[in-house]
Design a protein with these regions (language model features):
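Residues that recognize and position ribonucleotide moieties
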Residues: 80, 88, 106-108
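Conserved N-terminal Rossmann-fold NAD(P) cofactor-binding segment
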Residues: 69-70, 94
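Rossmann-like dinucleotide/flavin-binding elements
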Residues: 1-65, 98-164
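Short, conserved active-site loop motifs that form the nucleotide-linked donor/cofactor pocket
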Residues: 12, 78-80, 85, 138
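Generic cytosolic/nucleocytoplasmic N-terminal low-complexity/intrinsically disordered segments
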Residues: 49, 76, 91-93
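Helical element adjacent to the flavin cofactor pocket in flavoenzyme catalytic cores
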Residues: 71-78
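A conserved short coil-to-beta-strand element within the FAD-binding core of flavoproteins
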Residues: 1-2, 83-94
């Protein structure tokens, strides 16, 4: 989790956990992170009738065909995306950002905050398992390899299964 004040509040969750119904989600959601995980979560939550806004640190989203398709779906659902936003703090009823470039402070009222940024792979955990079963070939796929999209994870899992 990113280290910001309020990150440990009870209404702050990992976006994938919310998408899998593993935690309670309110009606007005701020998603922190506009990468594939954040955009996928925005599609999921807006499809459930939630009001969603995505906040991203970088100035522009896009690049891959998958991202462009997610952005198209979000536009259809009227999901707002705010770029150039650095998360400053999380409160009970809002999130606070600094607008990069202007230094302005911006607040967004919400009842749920979903984190889709700051993901890191845990390859050291995989390496520990390799030593437990040295005769077994271990394949690393999905976010265990590096933060990536669900499509890439499925492709890697498929390739690993073929090699087993």
């Amino acid at each position: 989790m990113p280290e910001v004040p309020g990150i440990d509040l009870p209404h702050v969750h990992w976006a994938p956990d919310a998408d899998m119904n593993k935690c309670p989600v309110g009606d007005k959601i701020a998603i922190i992170g506009g990468g594939s995980v954040g955009l996928e979560s925005a599609v999921t939550q807006s499809s459930r009738g939630k009001s969603v806004r995505v906040f991203e640190l970088v100035p522009a989203l896009g690049g891959t065909s998958e991202t462009r398709e997610l952005l198209r779906l979000l536009k259809e659902k009227s999901v707002e995306i705010s770029t150039n936003r650095r998360l400053v703090s999380i409160h009970k009823d809002k999130v606070v950002f600094t607008v990069i470039g202007t230094g302005d402070i911006e607040e967004y009222k919400c009842d749920t905050v979903l984190i889709a940024a700051g993901l890191v792979s845990r390859r050291d955990t995989v390496q520990a398992f390799r030593h437990l079963l040295p005769e077994t070939e271990v394949y690393i796929a999905g976010d265990a390899q590096a933060p990536r999209s669900i499509g890439e994870a499925i492709h890697e899992g498929f390739n690993a299964a073929i090699n087993i």
